[in-house]
Amino acid sequence: MANIRKTHPLAKIINNSFIDLPTPPNISAWWNFGSLLGICLILQILTGLFLAMHYTSDTTTAFSSVTHICRDVNYGWIIRYMHANGASMFFICLYMHMGRGLYYGSYTFTETWNVGIILLFTIMATAFMGYVLPWGQMSFWGATVITNLLSAVPYVGNDLVQWIWGGFSVDKATLTRFFALHFILPFVALALAAVHLLFLHETGSNNPSGIPSDSDKIPFHPYYTIKDILGALLLILTLMLLVLFSPDLLGDPDNYIPANPLSTPPHIKPEWYFLFAYAILRSIPNKLGGVLALILSILILAIIPLLHTSSQRGMMFRPISQCLFWLLVADLLTLTWIGGQPVEHPYIIIGQLASILYFMILLVLMPITSIIENHILKW
């Protein structure tokens, strides 16, 4: 009798994706983040589902319902904090995963890379709308400021903003639609993740050397399943340490004040994982220019495959490019810091310089460096 794992229509798909999948023998821990992202997504959907059972998307009761979850629902506090900090873990894994793709040239799998960018936008939209739901001060004002950016769109801007708000300000209609979209988008992300994997398994995984490994592959199970389980345990350990010891470490204290349209917080800022983009937005003293820079800071990833000028795939054997990559990481950390600071000297100029450097590294310095390295190799 044939092995059911290899013959059953459904089991066959799982087998070819997670068990008998031919995998390069030399992929490092940087390749763990894909599976960790899958775990994060499932964890967020499960905790979110239980939160949605008790949450009410009405401006008068939203804040109270979150308080009720934390105080009265059995283990509601841990579900709420796992969901909030799970989002932070999600973005940490996401940025690591993208960094790995940039460093090792995984963007040359253009279909996989482009689906990944769409996934990133989906998850960013989901996280933004989730931040609005507790209906605290930062929720309300964050929603007001970020949705208001759409008014910079020529001709239709104001109509677009009012259409998204469902009125003339962020109110009950906005909260209700944000809850509906926040609930549905993770399932869209789940479907996109399946497409992401589908495209990846068409080409097979990249590896640190960037050299094709078709002649030397090992099965995914047991070698990488055990490695992924170790990664998952470390992820859950980190998450639970965060949840149980300092659940509000990454949150904003202002969100414990109920939303008040008559009182503006001294410093409106999004969650920490959006601060780099927020800093780029603020670094341009023009509304439309800032919005364009904000969108381009993410969309720039789509043209990375076109800017690949190196004769080698990854950066493993390209020390000058490695220096530039880590400069980019440092620049993004600087932007994240600036995004959380008030708009005053010297933060304004630091933010502007860091924003210029971000685009310079990706659009100019990296392609030129790759060409120089190609010539050095021929000496």
UniProtKB/Swiss-Prot annotation:
Binding site for heme b b562: 83, 182
Keywords assigned by UniProt, alphabetized: Electron transport, Heme, Iron, Membrane, Metal-binding, Mitochondrion, Mitochondrion inner membrane, Respiratory chain, Transmembrane, Transmembrane helix, Transport, Ubiquinone
Binding partners and assembly: The cytochrome bc1 complex contains 11 subunits: 3 respiratory subunits (MT-CYB, CYC1 and UQCRFS1), 2 core proteins (UQCRC1 and UQCRC2) and 6 low-molecular weight proteins (UQCRH/QCR6, UQCRB/QCR7, UQCRQ/QCR8, UQCR10/QCR9, UQCR11/QCR10 and a cleavage product of UQCRFS1). This cytochrome bc1 complex then forms a dimer.
Record gene name: MT-CYB
Required cofactor names: heme b
Topological type in the membrane: Multi-pass membrane protein
Cited function: Component of the ubiquinol-cytochrome c reductase complex (complex III or cytochrome b-c1 complex) that is part of the mitochondrial respiratory chain. The b-c1 complex mediates electron transfer from ubiquinol to cytochrome c. Contributes to the generation of a proton gradient across the mitochondrial membrane that is then used for ATP synthesis.
GO biological process: mitochondrial electron transport, ubiquinol to cytochrome c
Miscellaneous note of the record: Heme 1 (or BL or b562) is low-potential and absorbs at about 562 nm, and heme 2 (or BH or b566) is high-potential and absorbs at about 566 nm.
TM stretches of this protein: 33-53, 77-98, 113-133, 178-198, 226-246, 288-308, 320-340, 347-367
Record-listed a ubiquinone binding positions: 201
Keyword Heme part of the UniProt annotation: yes
GO molecular function: metal ion binding; ubiquinol-cytochrome-c reductase activity
Classification of source organism: Eukaryota, Metazoa, Chordata, Craniata, Vertebrata
Any one GO cellular component localisation term in the record: respiratory chain complex III
Family the UniProt entry places it in: Belongs to the cytochrome b family.
UniProt xrefs under Pfam families: Cytochrom_B_C, Cytochrome_B
Residue sites binding heme b b566 per the record: 97, 196
Subcellular location: Mitochondrion inner membrane
Name of the protein described by the UniProt record: Cytochrome b
Cofactor stoichiometry and binding remark: Binds 2 heme b groups non-covalently.
Gene3D superfamilies assigned to the protein according to its UniProt record, in alphabetical order: Cytochrome Bc1 Complex, Chain C (1.20.810.10)
InterPro entries, A to Z: Cyt_b/b6_C, Cyt_b/b6_C_sf, Cyt_b/b6_N, Cytb/b6-like_sf, Cytochrome_b, Cytochrome_b_C_euk/bac, Cytochrome_b_N_euk/bac, Di-haem_cyt_TM
